[in-house]
Amino acid sequence: MKLLISFLMIFQMICTNVEFYGKSYIVYDSLNQYVVEGRNIDYLQSVASISKIMTAIVVIENSRLDKKITVDETINKAYGSCVYIHIKDQITIQDLLYGLMLRSGNDCALMLAKSVGGSVDRFVEMMNEKARDIGMKQTHFSNPSGLDEEDEGNLSTVKEMAMLYRYCCQNPLFNQIVKTKEYKRLDGKGYWHNKNRLLKEYPYCVGGKTGYTKKAKRTLITRAIKKQVDLIIVTFNCGNDFEFHQKKYEECFKNYEKLVLFDKGVRNIKGNWYLFENDLLMSKEKDESVSYLIHNEEMFIYRNQTYIKK
């Protein structure tokens, strides 16, 4: 018998002792796909270079890593953070992706967009199509880099950027790129260090992306996993963002734990047989009680007798 289990977004205040000095933030439970806590989670603003998360996943899903492209005059429009590739250089999609995500190369963003979309404008359409597919209803992308000096930039919220990052983390190649601390170009012409310093400073950090423009200020997404508790934090305009992320993770990991509701396999529940294709996991506060009710082949899960998801 098939059991329908789908996750709903909820808002709960769980970890609240770390002071936040910024515009908006979210702590997002990647496993259960809900909001642990946050502030101004639906506030819409330019998100700067964390936009490149969407750029990366669109490229990964629509191109081959080993494809070589010839750099053309498209990069003449690049400014700000760049890895300084040159016209007529031949470079792989793989190298461009690492330059995009580790060094936030705006030149990489433009060349990837041109290669995958045929034009930068068509690639931006692909970014917005993917946003709709993921359920990012407020988000709108104007370019593949996150620059916002010539227009309002790429607009999103901490909640929707967390949703995007969670989606991307289902892709093994994306995870491999964002957790890489140092990368040597395949052609040997460059050696790049990841700007996400939490990868070196915090052992449970497994990826993320930095961002900054004068308009957006600092933007940061990180992900950390400890004892299978999988959290994503997004901050906008937070001056001490790396410190805040690390302290918030430690606070949440102290109060949070993974619970296995049902192991993978065939299970008899109150006289009916159900097949669980994977372990059914959820995260909860350590002093929380969790219960469930099965009705019409749907499972309703309760925390402290409060319905949270089905």
Q: What is the predicted role of each segment?
A:
Residues 1-3, 310:
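N-terminal secretion targeting segments of exported proteins
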Residues 136-137, 152-263, 267-278, 284, ...:
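Domain-terminus/edge residues, biased toward the C-terminal soluble/receptor-binding domains
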